[in-house]
Amino acid sequence: MQANGAAAAAAGEEPAGSGCLSAHNGESSEPAHSNGVLSSNNGLSGTGSTGPTEQPGGRKKKRLSQADEDVIRLIGQHLHGLGLNQTVDLLMQESGCRLEHPSATKFRNHVMEGEWDKAENDLNELKSLVHSPHAVAACRPSSGGSGSEHSPTSCPTADVIRRMKFLLLQQKYLEYLEDGKVLEALQVLRCELTPLKYNTERIHVLSGYLMCSHADDLRAKAEWEGKGTASRSKLLDKLQTYLPPSVMLPPRRLQTLLRQAVELQRDRCLYHNTKLDNNLDSVSLLIDHVCSRKQFPCFTQQVLTEHCNEVWFCKFSNDGTKLATGSKDTTVIIWQVDPDTHQLKLLKTLEGHAYGVSYLAWSPDDNYLIACGPDDCSELWLWNVQTGELRTKMSQSHEDSLTSVAWNPDGKRFVTGGQRGQFYQCDLDGNLLDSWEGVRVQCLWCLSDGKTVLASDTHQRIRGYNFEDLTDRNIVQEDHPIMSFTISRNGRLALLNVATQGVHLWDLQDRVLVRKYQGVTQGFYTIHSCFGGHNEDFIASGSEDHKVYVWHKRSELPIAELTGHTRTVNCVSWNPQIPSLMASASDDGTVRIWGPAPYVDNQEFEEECSSMNS
């Protein structure tokens, strides 16, 4: 923010750098039209305050700091937006502050009244304020249908004024067109906009609006609200970016700061697991934001015991309505998730996987499920989930080992492979489309581009393979075997379970190791971890010490250790649609469903969820 008493401009302008004045206050201001800022200078004039001022009764008012002045202006702007104009007048009178520079106030009023010639003349008065050293920053594109221009931040003053003039004339042109004044609009286009020699591409677009047959057509094509308060307020928001905040406050500045504070508190909350609501009415500003562990999926809601041997894998469907579990007992069980109670019930049992089921993959539309077996298994099963019928049982050779599978995003192809060097791309009928020789695959994932397949191999790395042009490249290199990995929804992050090391987070774009998560016990068993929670802010993994570990993505220390299983936890799956629902599969033959604590028996909850804040 600017210091008090900034030098006044040559044309007798008041200093741009001060929001508070020491002179006496006169008559109250007129109500403003817009943007939550008072439309007059509250009768104030003079220079910035330099010391304590005399108040009625002989008391000296303490000189306000720059922070105090800023807060008063923010409060005044907010109160004015609520229509409390008399309160604003009293606040400004007692504090000796003003909300904005008088030239800016005049400019604002002329814009909101649609007095374009006067607003254009006001730009001459604002030149010296734009030139102020406080009018910072770089030219960046602005968004919006009628705002393809750039907004400034360290552009020459003449260029800034030209950009502001362009915005004014554009609004003037559109309003003429909407009113049916085509000749006047054409005059603005030819004699005022075009001579500016600025943003000729936009001028070509504007000229095309002359062909609009009626006002609705114009508003639709221009993506413009039409003549009136809404479009003019948006115009003012854009124009304000060219002026320093000491001259004109950014619109709704206090709300912006409060919203940022709430978002920061939520971001720092280790247990925040719900959708962010940017509406300030949904939160209390009187206390800091904090989520209780009791709202987090740390409590066992169900124990599924229908499998009769070790459960090696579990995975929720993409729509979150089903859970598939695979076991050493040769079966896959499909469970239905109740959308209201979040309880699971057995829907279908798929049998006949002679070697057991160690990996499962849902098709993108959840209509199909592929099941793979352990190292000795040369077959995979493609099931129709709706009917429970086996569509394809695929095997290329009895010597194969097909232990991993991943769906192409189109849902019509999948890739599969294993540690004996098989790496195939197939269609839904199991027909071989492509193959890659000599790749000993541990785990697979198809990226959203529909071309690239990520594969971890026996060389402790993840490589990207393109089946279209048959190219491959190294992406991740670890020092120990990668037992499994999964990719975040946006394709940016990879979560690896590394033998003897634990859980590692990699940035695939920058190809760097981001974080090593502590606590988990990982030997040479295949353990599958997952991203989860709202916005995938959390990470969960099984462990050989019989626990489920949960971390916040940015914290190396676990925020929860979930107990209940009695043997190694092989896999954890977080429901992609219900952030408070999680499943874990264990060698103890059970699948545990985790959710928030019930309203009663909190003592039992604390025993099950031992949480450590980082």
UniProtKB/Swiss-Prot annotation:
Signal peptide: none annotated. Pfam families: LisH_TPL, WD40. It is found in: Cytoplasm; Nucleus; Mitochondrion. Residues 1-65 are annotated as: Disordered. PROSITE patterns: CTLH, LISH, WD_REPEATS_2, WD_REPEATS_REGION. Residues 100-184 form the CTLH domain. Residues 1-19, 34-44 have a biased composition (Low complexity). Disulfide bonds: none annotated. GO terms for cellular component: mitochondrion; nucleus. The keyword Nucleus applies. Keywords: Cytoplasm, Mitochondrion, Nucleus, Repeat, WD repeat. Residues 67-99 form the LisH domain. It comes from the Eukaryota. WD repeats lie at residues 306-345, 352-391, 397-437, 477-516, 519-561, 564-604. The keyword tRNA-binding does not apply. Forms homooligomers. Identified in the CTLH complex that contains at least MAEA, RMND5A (or alternatively its paralog RMND5B), GID8, WDR26, and RANBP9 and/or RANBP10. Interacts with DDB1-CUL4A/B E3 ligase complexes. G-beta-like protein involved in cell signal transduction. Acts as a negative regulator in MAPK signaling pathway. Functions as a scaffolding protein to promote G beta:gamma-mediated PLCB2 plasma membrane translocation and subsequent activation in leukocytes. Core component of the CTLH E3 ubiquitin-protein ligase complex that mediates ubiquitination and subsequent proteasomal degradation of target proteins. This is WD repeat-containing protein 26. It comes from Xenopus tropicalis.
